[in-house]
Amino acid sequence: MHTNLRTFLKQLEEYGKAHDAQEPEHSRKLLNLEADTAELVSILAQSACAKRALEIGTSNGYSTIWLAASIGPSGGRVISIERSREKQTMARENPAKAGLLEYLDLRLGDATGVIRTLPGPFDFVFFDADRSSAPDQLDLLLPKLSSRALVLADNALSHPEQIAGYITMVNGLEHFQHVIVPVGKGLSVAFATLT
């Protein structure tokens, strides 16, 4: 990743922290990934040679930029879903400033509804939104996963009660290896071997 992009991401990271510290309404907070988590998500996407990634929860595009920079130049594409129009506006502006908009397909709407309309296959999925809806969304995505897909979810340690249904579901899936990595707020990493 080139220096200018790292500088821009650092600015977004700092803006996100300052914004969230002042914003009293939870739904208006940006809730960006921690830098270490974003770096790990990027490394995993590159290592998987992901070509078709799905991000659930775009926010202002911070993690979306990490994903697009990781897989876009090698032919990958990121579909990212956000339900807040205000956040999606930022999510369109920020990747454009980073020169990565061409690798993105930004969708506005309820993620569960949007997922129903999306064709597969996906070889990389990143859940970073409403944790209580994640099990239903994963259920919709299972038939749309590639045979060796990576499925990630943030907040696995910071919000254990809210993400418990998702973690239980992933742990119960045959042909999935799963681990929670203690980085940032906890990153759930599941590898599907659906041969």
Question: What do these predicted regions represent?
Answer:
Residues 1-124, 131-152, 156-195:
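A short alpha-helical cap/connector motif
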